[in-house]
Amino acid sequence: MGPEKPRAVIAAARANGVGVMGIRAVQAGALTSAIDRPLPDDHPEMRDYRRAEGFRRLAAELQTNPASLAHRYALRLDIDTLVLGVKNRQELVDCVAAAAAGPLPAELVMQIDRSVNRDGD
């Protein structure tokens, strides 16, 4: 599934006066620097992590933390709230800083969309 489907769902919700809540901005760790728990190589979250390698490369090119980039990407969508799912104070500080940095430019959003391998491993 590419970025078009979630955006279509958000647009449909908006058209019907329904609020939208974003969840899993870092995709259970796939859009972070590293998975922080042991998982078997064939676990779905590990497959997602491998698919996001291009996203992490892009974050490195931009000299930013992948999780911060993921949060800024999520905040660029037309949503009412974003569930952060932080595990510690530093992650909360990082999320607040990402929000303070403001929305991503549309060109960067398109670059991120192209960076993620949605076809599999």
Q: What kind of region is each of these model predictions?
A:
Residues M1-D121:
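Beta/alpha (TIM)-barrel catalytic core signal, keyed to glycine-rich beta->alpha loops juxtaposed to Asp/Glu
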